[in-house]
Regions:
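Mature soluble binding/inhibitory domains
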Residues: 18-326
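Sec-dependent signal peptide recognition
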Residues: 2-10
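C-terminal motif of bacterial Sec signal peptides marking the signal peptidase cleavage site
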Residues: 13-16
Length: 326
């Protein structure tokens, strides 16, 4: 279970008919251990947020289906429909959603497949209801052969979903937390650099911004012209099966601050594509300067927000050119 604006999800994505593989806190912590905070590598699949499995087929009648288990209860497969109002202009990710009536959780999703069909990824989240949210991401690999070595470069678009947003339905009269919420999306550019000689990968997500629907949003402590910080995907190892995981950082006053993790899979002959996922927590919204309570005239840097904001995201990228060697 996940505390609203906080801690992971229990999801399982499955796709359609042909069944192709698709791949310092300011609140009290939950009573149980948080789950799904680090990417988990499986067979041709990497998940985060306790996504158990995923199949995505953009050509199927029902490209995306999602199974959400609330507190380990009965899992029910749901078809996610195309969400036209959730599309973001120029973003090469398909938009989906599911809501079983206007008084239930509103789940928003984005998914994409590489141009060669070798990898795909999906991210799903609701914005919260009844003091909890459920969300996560998955990357999957259809096929892969490793290059003999050299540097691979991958550039393109990133999309993430946060565990807060605007009301997306109605609860009973007088209800507060019972009103469902739709996740805001965050978009950006991503650059992945992979060294297949050394078996290492790293990258950066930059030009990050909230979608237009969140134009009025400012995290707690932010003022004026607010900008999301760049997030660096620090060096991680590439396994023989093309999977990888690593940490994510922002830079604060010259210091590197961990804000989460990333993972994914390379795909295609000689790693022509890559699908990745992210999970960012406390600090990913940036920091603010406040007056020091102990040093007159001094300032301290504190994370924006209330400390429980979470972002799950994905990227699906094609190689931008032939590999180079030193």
């Amino acid at each position: 279970m996940n505390k609203l604006i906080g801690f992971g999800a229990v999801l399982a994505l499955v796709a359609a008919c042909d069944q192709r593989p698709s791949g310092d806190d300011t609140v009290e912590p939950p009573t149980q251990e948080p789950v799904g905070e680090e990417p988990v590598v499986g067979t041709r699949q990497v998940t985060v947020g306790d996504l158990n499995s995923a199949l995505y087929n953009p050509d199927a009648t029902n490209p995306l289906r999602v199974r959400v288990s609330l507190d380990g209860g009965v899992q029910q497969l749901q078809v996610y429909g195309v969400y036209v109002d959730g599309r973001i202009a120029g973003l090469p990710y398909e938009s989906y959603s599911f809501q079983d009536g206007g008084d239930s959780r509103f789940f928003r999703a984005f998914a994409a497949e590489s141009s060669d069909g070798s990898v795909n990824a999906a991210v799903v989240s609701d914005g919260g209801q009844f003091n909890r949210f459920f969300g996560g991401a998955v990357a999957n690999q259809e096929n892969y052969s490793a290059p003999s070595g050299g540097l691979g470069r991958y550039r393109g678009d990133y999309v993430g979903l946060v565990n807060f947003g605007d009301p997306a339905g109605e609860g009973p009269e007088g209800a507060g937390s019972g009103v469902p919420t739709e996740s805001y999306a965050i978009t950006g550019d991503v650059f992945i650099l992979a060294d297949f000689t050394e078996g290492a990968v790293n990258g950066e997500i930059f030009n990050r911004e909230f979608e237009a629907a969140a134009a009025g949003y400012l995290p707690t402590g932010a003022e004026g012209d607010y900008e999301l910080p760049n997030i660096v995907l620090v060096v991680g190892d590439i396994a023989s099966n093309g999977s990888f995981t690593g940490g994510a950082e922002i830079t604060v006053d010259g210091q590197f601050v961990n804000v989460g993790s990333y993972g994914g899979l390379f795909g295609g002959t000689n790693a022509t594509s890559v699908a990745g996922l992210t999970r960012f927590g406390t600090g990913f919204l940036g920091v603010a300067e406040i007056a020091s309570p102990t040093a007159p005239g001094g300032v301290i840097l504190v994370p924006l927000g209330n400390g429980n904001e979470i972002e799950h995201g994905i990227f699906v990228l094609d190689s931008t050119g032939p590999f180079t060697t030193d």
